[in-house]
């Protein structure tokens, strides 16, 4: 036929059998990719340290999505929280991966069948014997079925009525586990961080979809609306389908980047705004002050801080620190976290506590500045020693650690103090193993960043596709140069497939 690459999809115009075939093949490819990618990730995933080397640090992409839906066990005998598993069964990572691969194979065979047997009676009007697709009715069927699936997910899977529930955690990502969720029917259900909204919104949207589907199955569109919106043209279906996809992509890009109950910190890593706003730092400070109020020593108060919480308060886990074109997992950048060294407290020679100013997200380098509780600069690591007034040596800065591996260890050597001041710019200080993976020391983004970038980019592309195909179907006669004052009762382009012998060649 000699079609250019960007027009090859015209081969399925006015060929509903093969249109179905290519969609089934697409489903086969998607399901096959999901299953295969899961098996690959399971082959490289190390579940031994869910606190300092969680899935998102290792660059896992599909495992977090499976986990948030209630899968936590592996046939290898481990689960995502670090416990030992005896009999994981089918509802496991390998079980679901295998199911997707088997489903992909069945879809592949179905696609071949529909490609070979494309000319089915169901596509023809029994009254006229001509090719006829009732697209509004097809829309109603799809809407009804998607409504049933949506309602079923919210009413059964999420609530635990028939299913495991979903991943639910506290606001600081410390106690996450899979559990049933009760629907939130009040105003709190609109809070994106309330898991109950997931159940209630799926139930409500499912009911709406079922009712809308029944409406479109039982009520015919007015002729003026049918003609005006080109409801008989398959390209109208393409345009509106692309609109649904790009809208969904924009939504999930937002919920992933800004955070929500659907994108837990434990599965996808912190958001950049949690670093920008000092979210975890403030919680750590609150816990330390609460410990001191209970007459605990500084060492005891800091030792009670969970290592998991301290690790979140480290800039290397900020998804905006890694460049989008730096390939690889976070562990390939700054290394595998081995342990928390503790919280450094800096003091000048008068004993006044100093605080290291933290690096903002979009800086690669940042001056090392130490300020007092009023925010006044008291010490720094100068760029030019000859002009320095606040150098560590001149001010007599010392550092002492509380909690972690260096608990109650102090340093007065200026070189060591400056080393830890530089590292304190990046949040809590951790020992990082760069040798195992030959990590290069350059920050990487987390799956949260990759997902957002991919979905926002494709949403923009699909938005353009929606405009393109919508304009083509609405203004097809204009683009083709048909006289707008033509009185003949014809629908131009009813048969527009190249080489179609049924195309009418005479003017009606």
From Swiss-Prot:
The keyword Transmembrane applies. It is found in: Plastid, Chloroplast thylakoid membrane. This is Photosystem II CP47 reaction center protein. GO terms for biological process: photosynthetic electron transport in photosystem II. It comes from Pinus koraiensis. HAMAP family: PSII_PsbB_CP47. PANTHER family: PHOTOSYSTEM II CP43 REACTION CENTER PROTEIN (PTHR33180:SF37). Keywords: Chlorophyll, Chloroplast, Chromophore, Membrane, Photosynthesis, Photosystem II, Plastid, Thylakoid, Transmembrane, Transmembrane helix.
